């Protein structure tokens, strides 16, 4: 049992270890945004209908950061959208989103980028139907699904 009060945790985020002091109820999303200043994953402020805008990759799997406590993910490898840029180099999913006009307001974009990256890591030669099914846990209220699936399909067929 953890608490009451703050507890120390060590999180491995984007390849670096971070020692944090958090309340046991602190979600991974809150720890990332409030303590590590990694604001790419978004808080859609409605726990009853998560849009997936807070998607991160934990040990290779797309996960909503708002559904995990920071104390739960110690020892796991956490990857945020910020990890998909190294210097001037962008991950092909990010460049594919731009090339396929896969964003409008941009709120869902980081979550969709991470869900797409995780999905294509597991199924690099996916078909359109597999992509649509694989990204079904994320919601775009602007309706840019055509561009998002076009991006994933372009990568699956050989690159962005």
Where are the language model's segments positioned?
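Signature of N-terminal electron-transfer/Fe-S-associated modules in redox systems
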Residues: 1-160
